[in-house]
From Swiss-Prot:
Subunit relationships: The complex is composed of two ATP-binding proteins (NupO), two transmembrane proteins (NupP and NupQ) and a solute-binding protein (NupN).
Induction: Transcriptionally regulated by CodY.
CDD domains: TM_PBP1_transp_TpRbsC_like
Annotated family: Belongs to the binding-protein-dependent transport system permease family.
Listed name of the protein: Guanosine ABC transporter permease protein NupP
Task of the protein: Part of an ABC transporter complex involved in the uptake of guanosine. Responsible for the translocation of the substrate across the membrane. May be a nucleoside transporter of broad specificity but with various affinities for different substrates.
Pfam families associated with the record: BPD_transp_2 (PF02653)
Keywords from the named record: Cell membrane, Membrane, Transmembrane, Transmembrane helix, Transport
GO CC entries: plasma membrane
Location in the cell: Cell membrane
Membrane topology, from the record: Multi-pass membrane protein
């Protein structure tokens, strides 16, 4: 119970310290802390449109966070979520633009294709790790760049005739919901949030309730003991990266089938995959934690857009707040050390 409480307190303390640091930066820079954070709040909850946009931003964050968290829980570091997301995005749009058909066939097929593409892209570093002991961090980082340039080539040379972006996907493959758009003052909120929450339930079930999840966690904790117990270390490493990549591919589908409904040539990474690392760390690599952390980061990202408009505070202040929060979460040992000292002092 005490350990679980500690896991909850560390992120909360990190959030408070991050917000305090943001307030200090605003004060030093000559801005009003009250108006700055008021603008941030209004940018999230001030209008129903902003609420819709916040939930829309949360959706890919949940899935990219799950991708990172799943790998972390099984002893692997998937830094290639950004690349897997781009591959999934392109694959989903390819299916979405290739043909028209019944929505109950077309949309699931596009989602499955995105998950399969992301999973395959994650499987490559998985098999290199399992068979040739190549460290997954190096491979996944390099594969991000391969994915960026490969998907750009496919968009401009395969999906289009030397165009910078594809046409709009068919309505039968779209995650857009007229009902959700209408009730949120025509924001870009779409049905992807349901997919993301279902994915969180699936991760929770696999990790905590299935035999395969126990094997994956055991291999991540101690490969030698797992092999001695009869588990296939190689198979579990590849399976873990496959599932992690599938979550990332779905994150790309949320953008391709929901937010934008097309794929475009990109000059740089989207950042959603890298933000997934922050989401996973802040969420303690648990399914519920990832959902909550995605809500926080998604809210901060959308709310920050309103800060320069309403209060004149640069939106970059929120980037600093997020960075400090992650810094404190990553250095959670220091927070636990201080908490332990305070507890001992209180006992005396």
């Amino acid at each position: 119970m005490v350990k679980r409480l500690s896991h909850l307190l560390v992120p909360l303390i990190a959030i408070i310290l991050g917000l305090a640091a943001g307030a200090l930066i605003m004060l030093v820079s000559g801005y009003s802390v009250a108006s700055g954070y008021s603008a941030l709040w209004n940018g999230i909850f001030g209008e129903i449109y902003y609420v819709g946009e916040t939930i829309r931003q949360i959706t890919p964050y949940i899935l990219s966070g799950l991708a990172v968290a799943f790998a972390f829980r099984t002893g692997l570091f998937n830094i290639g979520v950004e690349g897997q997301l781009l591959v999934g995005w392109t694959a989903a749009v390819w299916v979405g633009t290739a043909f028209d058909g019944p929505a109950y066939i077309h949309l699931p097929l596009a989602l499955i294709t995105a998950a399969a593409a992301g999973g395959l892209w994650g499987f490559i570093p998985g098999i290199l790790k399992a068979r040739f002991y190549v460290h997954e961090v190096i491979v996944t980082i390099m594969m991000n760049y391969i994915a960026l340039h490969m998907t750009n080539y496919i968009i401009s040379n395969v999906l289009t005739d030397h165009q910078d972006k594809t046409g709009k996907i068919h309505e039968s493959a779209s995650l857009r919901s007229p009902f959700l758009e209408q009730i949120t003052d025509y924001s870009r909120l779409h049905l992807g949030i349901i997919v993301a929450l279902l994915a969180a339930v699936i991760m929770w079930f696999i990790i905590n309730k299935s035999t395969k999840g126990f094997e994956l966690r055991a291999v991540g904790f101690n490969q030698h003991a797992s092999q001695y117990a009869g588990m296939s270390v190689r198979k579990n490493i590849m399976t873990s990266m496959l599932i992690s990549g599938a979550f990332a591919g779905l994150a790309g589908a949320m953008e391709g089938l929901g937010t934008f409904e097309y794929a475009a040539v990109k000059g740089a990474f989207t950042g959603v995959g890298f933000d997934g690392i922050a989401v996973a760390l802040l969420g303690g690599n648990t399914a519920v934690g990832v959902v909550l952390a995605a809500c926080l980061l998604g809210g901060l990202k959308i709310g920050a857009l309103n800060m320069p408009i309403e209060s004149g505070v640069p939106s970059e202040v929120v980037d600093i707040v997020i960075a400090i929060i992650i810094l404190f979460v990553a250095s959670s040992y220091a927070i636990r050390f201080v908490m332990g000292k305070l507890k001992k002092k209180g006992a005396n």
